[in-house]
Amino acid sequence: MRYPMSKLAYHRVLLKLSGEALMGSADYGIDPKVINRLAGEVIEAQNAGAELALVIGGGNIFRGAGLAAKGMDRVTGDHMGMLATIINALAMQDALEKLGTKVRVMSAIKINNVCEDFIRRRAIRHLEKSRITIFAAGTGNPFFTTDSGAALRAIEIGADLLLKATKVDGIYNKDPQKHCDAVKYSTLSYDEVISQNLEVMDTAAFALARDSNLPLRIFDIEQPGVLLRILHGEEIGTLVKERNSKS
């Protein structure tokens, strides 16, 4: 059942998933049960009337920065990481299509026999036609993370909200896994994140979001139904925005 768009707090969103989110309890690769569950969450949100774009990291398959630290050429490593994100995008496309929805994968690097090139106007048209759109290969440039790619694409498509899915239910003043007295923030401004040196996403990605006044919500993707609840305005996780923003 599709609900009226007016019932949603956010109509067009970009969801950033880490590659590790696809692994489940495994040490490498993609757990079919996990990716199918995540696909179900995305479909549920789409059925509520949302326009959904996704960016998926590649860390479950390859981390270019890690091997660069051990001597591999950084540019080569980052290009390999981009290919890993395409693998994950195709896997998610397959999982979503098996649930009966239309999906497009758009890559920042040319791989035309596999997926479309990223063209901004075409991406927006896909979203307007209720096609879930997955952006792969980051920004297409080395030295930029998939967080930066997610922030950039969210701005380009005019997203109402950038969602960063993690295994922690928000932003804390210190690591909640190490400190039992860690305090969770419900809302933060961009300046507060910077002044408190809180780790939200990499600096380039955060600067893009801040400069474009793009609201960012950090949340735990492992909670069932959480994506739909956020789209309907529930205060889940931590929202980062300018203090004068109404989002």
Swiss-Prot record:
GO terms for cellular component: cytosol. UMP binds at G58, D78, T139, G140, N141, P142, F143, F144, T145, T146. It is found in: Cytoplasm. Pathway: Pyrimidine metabolism; CTP biosynthesis via de novo pathway; UDP from UMP (UMPK route): step 1/1. ATP binds at K16, L17, S18, G19, G59, R63, T166, Y172, D175. The keyword Nucleotide-binding applies. Its main location: cytoplasm. One of its GO terms (molecular function) is ATP binding. Pfam families: AA_kinase. Its EC number is 2.7.4.22. It catalyses: UMP + ATP = UDP + ADP. Inhibited by UTP. GO terms for biological process: 'de novo' CTP biosynthetic process; UDP biosynthetic process. It is an enzyme of class 2 (transferase). The keyword Cytoplasm applies. Catalyzes the reversible phosphorylation of UMP to UDP. Homohexamer. Belongs to the UMP kinase family. This is Uridylate kinase. It comes from Xylella fastidiosa (strain 9a5c). The lineage of its organism: Bacteria, Pseudomonadati, Pseudomonadota, Gammaproteobacteria, Lysobacterales. The gene is pyrH.
